[in-house]
Structures are given as structure tokens and as C-alpha cells.
Curated annotation (Swiss-Prot):
This is Alkanal monooxygenase alpha chain. The keyword Protease does not apply. The keyword Membrane does not apply. It is an enzyme of class 1 (oxidoreductase). It comes from the Bacteria. Transmembrane segments: none annotated. One of its GO terms (biological process) is bioluminescence. Light-emitting reaction in luminous bacteria. Keywords: Flavoprotein, FMN, Luminescence, Monooxygenase, Oxidoreductase, Photoprotein. GO terms for cellular component: cytosol. Heterodimer of an alpha and a beta chain. InterPro entries: Alkanal_monooxygenase (IPR033924), Bact_Lucif_Oxidored (IPR050766), Bacterial_luciferase_CS (IPR018235), Luciferase-like_dom (IPR011251), Luciferase-like_sf (IPR036661), Luciferase_bac/NFP (IPR002103). It comes from Photorhabdus laumondii subsp. laumondii (strain DSM 15139 / CIP 105565 / TT01). It holds the Pfam family Bac_luciferase.
Amino acid sequence: MKFGNFLLTYQPPQFSQTEVMKRLVKLGRISEECGFDTVWLLEHHFTEFGLLGNPYVAAAYLLGATKKLNVGTAAIVLPTAHPVRQLEDVNLLDQMSKGRFRFGICRGLYNKDFRVFGTDMNNSRALTECWYGLIKNGMTEGYMEADNEHIKFHKVKVNPTAYSKGGAPVYVVAESASTTEWAAQFGLPMILSWIINTNEKKAQLELYNEVAQEYGHDIHNIDHCLSYITSVNYDSNKAQEICRDFLGHWYDSYVNATTIFDDSDKTRGYDFNKGQWRDFVLKGHRDTNRRIDYSYEINPVGTPQECIDIIQKDIDATGISNICCGFEANGTVDEIIASMKLFQSDVMPFLKEKQRSLL
């Protein structure tokens, strides 16, 4: 069993940006003390939904501030920056941390990112696949060159080279069937969404495994991650109530940060996300409180035993044993840390014990 901690860097209305950055640093350091293997950093621009425009820089700080903790991105918006510059950053972090950096990628969901950084969002999938291919070759060969419809440049040496054999581990934030199939072709581990239920997670893994096996990958040796919003309290009602205000603002900020969910938006390649949003609306989840209530049904928010039951159900359905939680909805920094420590003492050991008994 492995455990990760998502650091969202969302700015609630009552907090300044300086307070959010202090929270990021403190929670990163505390994560190592609380037995988490990895912290994950999210890339966002131009929105309070996330203040971290450059996760590479934040990762460098946290890697330097810790001794054993892995630090990953969940995820870098791959098509909005030049692939050579990105590999230089990834290799540098891989070298300086002696292999503790994790390179999580996605193709992006937010229109402003693409407009400001000069990338056509309609091509996000093709660019992501192209950029990944260039970066992966650069990780193993030490050189990069390109001559295709998306990008052209002469062969260059990438410095520094990777520290880890084959390069820093790559993860993919995957929600749609097409992204799942693409990740499976390369045997890349997925970070599964916290907004889908157990049956949906199981179906996604079944699709992945079918494709991965066709491409010759050992599906029993792929480090997928289950992601969750998490709040642990001996009083289940308190666990839910402490998160409600944060999640309400956070959900609304997410919807407002992109026009993808607007029926008038014609951006190509996001049919899955638009369809998922329509399903939310039909279920009444456009109402923020109803979305929060549904989130509580499928995420570990409650007593330690309730959290164990929810996570173990997903572990048993998917076989995934890398559990990644986000605790920032728990209020103040002290309240967040208290929930993390209770998760460490009253949830982690029992998930490990049950997992061992299943082997």
C-alpha cells in the first residue's frame, strides 16, 4: 500500500494568497511526517481554483525541504509548454532529488491556458500525445528532435540527463475512454478521478487492462492511483460539515474557470467532459449542495471506519493500492493536519492489514 496527498492550493474567500502558499509548504512537510509517500501538485492559471502556475518550482522547494517524500505533478498541462523545456525541468528535478520526482501529465481543460500560452485547444489531444512521445524518447536517449505537423526542431542534447532509469515515472490524469486507452497503450499508470463511483472505476480499469495486455504490458505491475477528497473525524457529521463551505466554493470555482461546460462552446475533443457535466445536471448535481452530498457517498469523508470501508471497496474492485487523498477541505491548517494524522493512525494501518490478507 502507498499513500499520497494532493495539495490543491485553492484560495478560499477568507484566505490570502500568502496564507495559501504557507499552507502548501507546511502541509508538504507534514505529509512526510504523517507517513505519506508522495504529495501531488496541481497546475492551474488565472483562477483561485488553484494558485500553482508552475508546479515544477513548487516541487523543487518541497523536494529540498524533505528527505524521503516523493513529489509529483497532478498534473502538468502538457501541450501548453515546449517539450524540450519541460524535459529539462523534469530531468533537473529527477537528478537533484535522486529520483523522488513524479511526472504527472494531462492535456488541459481550461480555455484561458491555451489562449494565453498560444496553443490551439482543439489540438490538445494530438499535442499531448506528440509531446509525450518526444519527452519519453528524450528521457531514454538524452537527445530530442522533431519534424512533424505540430513541431519542428533540430536534434539537441537535453541537459541534464535523467537520474532514474528510463526517466522520471510518468502518470496520466485519465477520465475519458480515449485517454484511458492511450495511457494503456504505453503502460502508463493513471490517476483516477475522485468524482466517479466504484463501478465506474472498475469499468475504467477493465478497459485499461484489456488494451494494456494487447500491447504486451504486465497489468499487475502498473502503479495506478485512486484519488479522493478526504476528511476523517470520530464524528461523521462533523467530518462532512467542516468540508461543506470549502467544497461549495471550490466546486463553483471549478465550473467558472472554464467554458467547456457551456453549451455554446464548440471546442473539439472534450465530448466526454461535456457529457459528464450534462449527466451531473440531469442528476441535479448542478446544485452545489447536492454535488457535495454525492461526493460524500463516494469519498472517505466520515469516521475512520467509514473511510476504511469506502476506500477498501475501491481497492477490492480495482486492485489499486496507491491511495491519494486531498485534505484541504478540512478548514484551518491545524484542522487539516489533525485529519491527516487521524487518517495515518486510524485508517492507513487497517487498509494495509486488509490488503495483505487479500494477497
